[in-house]
Amino acid sequence: MILKHSPRCLKINRVICYLLLLMVLGYSPFIMYDIYVKSVELEFYSLHMEDMNYNGSDFECIIPDYDPNDAQAKKFLRTSPIIKCGQPQPYLTYLSPDGYIHLNQTAIELSGRQTDDYQCMYTEIFRHKKSDDKFELGVPQIFQETEKIRSSAFVLVKCFLKTGKLAYESGHAYIPQPSPELFEASRRGSDGDVNRPSVLIFGLDSMSRLNFMRQLPRTYHFITNVLDAVVFKGMTKTGDNTFPNMMAFLAGKNVHVRNKESGKLSVHKPSYFDDIPLVWDSFKTNGYTTMYDEDCPGLTIFNFGAWGFKKTPTDYYARPFWLAMDSIKNFKSRDSRCYGNTPKHMYLLKYLKEFVTKMKDHRYFAFAFLTLLSHDDLNEVQVADSDFEEMFLNMRRNGELNNTVVIVLGDHGNRFSDLRKTDIGRVEERMPFLAVSLPEEFKRRHPHLEKGLQQNDDNLLSWFDFYEMLMDLANNNLGEKSVVERYGKIGKSPFRWISKKRTCGQAGIPEEYCICAREMQLATDDDRVRYNEA
């Protein structure tokens, strides 16, 4: 269950060396493809784009304005197959929001058997005491019909027939009630201010603004028309992949190091992140209950190429559950997007929805990040559009968003599709989706904040700016003028005016990802034209 560096090849046997070699050969096409695409991008910009004064102050950035259904993109769009988990096993158990594990009598009847034909047991899942990449299991507990889970929020469940044959294996997660101390600290009005809003962040890996509009039209319509969210057309990534972008957003940190000789960027990544102040720490200090959840344990922000956290980073932390679910070997669906009978993304949505429901009368900060459906394939996330819409619809219908700032985002655009070889693809890969919805009562109390968002919706912005916005919310810095110049070293809160005459350098966007450039006409006798034709 541990995701750490392997020992050196000289210290292991020859068979493992061969296996490692096969793995390297297997991954090499992906590595070479990435290198190829980046070289194509660099060549395109050097040949066809005009440098727009990266660090100067005498120009206004012209934000590229592509139609999501541009002809260049259409040939890369397709209808993704719907998720078909099938019925690899009956739904023999479920976990209710009050923490009780139940036998599903309806499923038992449909299986053609009786309750007595099954012996079921649950095993609690715990975070490993020393590793963020492992989990621990409690002692299996046999239960009859229904039983209260003892101390964990996560369980694995197995059911056997009288013959001893395994008939069912699955897992469940729920949101326990906060401890009395946490309950009181996060209760709205416990410090005399009943109006502090909660913050809900729902992220999708590799999701550009344009592709969000293409693939998730129902969710986009709900966010923009029902939640009245502001969508930021000039939002630009600050790094190649998830980690540098989310470190800018969640910590206000620039993790890039530029080689003085080659000029190339590299990323500094610590082994552990406990000593790095993250935004949820600031919310926690100010009486918020915190939650963090990702659906792909091998590719999470803080564990891919690193070791995560020594201690649990937030009050509610679902990583042990996902590690345990990935360990299940039986009753797998033919559809890799499922755990048994259930689409994997539904576990994340259910956990987030239950958290929001139980924290309705409490201040909370929730960060849920979905990777599995959106990371690799340009089109696959479309299968979850109605599920995302329904989650937000239910939250709103139940009054759970009445005092909640909702942020929906992508970290960057898709990095693997051949769309990147086109003009529109090169641009949108740099321009992630970002939408912010302020609750109505909050807007009435602070109209200048909504005005600031609207004024900046087509400005050049980066993740450093939205880190500043999160810190404003965490610290109740909501006046027309900020009480601090900034919380990090880069960035300006989009709650307040940001100049349109802003450069990528001023926004913390590396030159490699700057979109403040224009295509230019070249004379037919230009050396660059002759080079390109060669």
Where are these regions (language model features)?
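Histidine-centered active-site microenvironments of extracellular/periplasmic hydrolases
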Residues: 305-313, 397-449, 479-510
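Short coil/turn segments at secondary-structure boundaries
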Residues: 35-37, 170-173, 213-217, 261-264, ...
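A long, amphipathic alpha-helix that forms part
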Residues: 12-22, 27, 149-152, 191-193, ...
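N-terminal signal-anchor transmembrane helix specifying type II single-pass membrane topology
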Residues: 1-44
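Substrate-binding rim/cap in mid-to-C-terminal beta-strand-loop elements of soluble/periplasmic
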Residues: 239-257, 422-477
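Beta-strand-enriched, solvent-exposed domains that form extended recognition/catalytic surfaces
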Residues: 40-189
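Polar, surface-exposed loop/tail segments
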Residues: 301-303, 449-457, 461-468, 472-533
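Active-site-proximal alpha/beta segments of enzymes that process anionic O-linked groups
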Residues: 152-154, 179-379, 472
